Swiss-Prot record:
Keywords: Ribonucleoprotein, Ribosomal protein, RNA-binding, rRNA-binding. PANTHER family: 30S RIBOSOMAL PROTEIN S18, SMALL RIBOSOMAL SUBUNIT PROTEIN BS18M. This is Small ribosomal subunit protein bS18. GO terms for biological process: translation. Binds as a heterodimer with protein bS6 to the central domain of the 16S rRNA, where it helps stabilize the platform of the 30S subunit. Part of the 30S ribosomal subunit. Forms a tight heterodimer with protein bS6. Gene3D superfamilies: Ribosomal protein S18. Pfam families: Ribosomal_S18. Belongs to the bacterial ribosomal protein bS18 family.
Length: 78
């Protein structure tokens, strides 16, 4: 039979932005944006970070703007 043996089930991830009452994601806030980027420089998906769809879209736009303004790298250094 498929399924988990023992232990607890998966814990539901909560959206970072709704939990902290953040309504505006600023592209200049590089420290916040770096939390949602992988070590290779890719944007982490919702299933990994737990952000809601609304804030994932805003986050993606902010990261892309920060990359355009050279605040964040497009790819990570080797």
């Amino acid at each position: 039979m498929a399924g988990r043996k023992g232990g607890r089930g998966k814990r539901r991830k909560v959206c970072y932005f709704t939990a902290n009452n953040i309504t505006h994601i600023d592209y200049k806030d590089v420290d916040l944006l770096k939390k949602f980027i992988s070590e290779r420089g890719k944007i982490l998906p919702r299933r990994v970070t737990g952000t809601s769809a609304k804030y994932q879209r805003k986050l993606t736009v902010a990261i892309k703007r920060a990359r355009q303004m050279a605040l964040l790298p497009y790819v990570a250094d080797e």
